[in-house]
Amino acid sequence: MYKHMLLPTDGSKLSEKAIMHGVALAKALKAKITAVTVSPPYSAIGSDAVIEMDASQRAVQYLDAVRKAAAAAKVDCDAIHLKDDLPYRAIIAAAKKQHCDLIVMASHGRRGISAMVLGSVTARVIAHGALPVLVCR
């Protein structure tokens, strides 16, 4: 069925829950996973350089958590850190580039005004992508 799953993570508790579901599903299906985290691109000078270093350190932590969960389940795992102003676009592009056949991700479940103002990365991945998406809450 599914052979290669993309697991986007933002380090949130909901994202960690989705990772656990994704790793368990990958183990059951004997599938490979690719973890991805996306941070905005920053300028290489000034205070942006400090922000970028912090974002890079967080990305390493997020991806290491996925690697650790995958290793514990004996699931093959790659991990990539992407930089893009639009996380949904980077997630869709990563899934295509890595030849994934399923995306497993969290939804924060925002409703009403906050959903309209903040938007939803998950909703945009579903709307703009071509792959099936397993949404975890």
Features from the language model and the residues they span:
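Gly/Ser-rich helix-loop-strand patches that form or flank binding pockets
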Residues: 24, 96-137
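Acidic, proline/glycine-rich short linear motifs
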Residues: 36-65, 93
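Structural beta-alpha unit
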Residues: 71-103
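Short, well-ordered secondary-structure micro-motifs
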Residues: 18, 45-48, 89-92, 115-117
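Small/aliphatic-rich secondary-structure junction motif
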Residues: 3-49, 69-78
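Structural motif
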Residues: 36, 80-82, 136
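Aromatic/hydrophobic pocket-lining residues that form π-stacking "cages" and hydrophobic walls in ligand
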Residues: 22, 66, 91, 125
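Short glycine-rich, flexible loops that bind phosphorylated cofactors or substrates
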Residues: 14, 87, 111-113
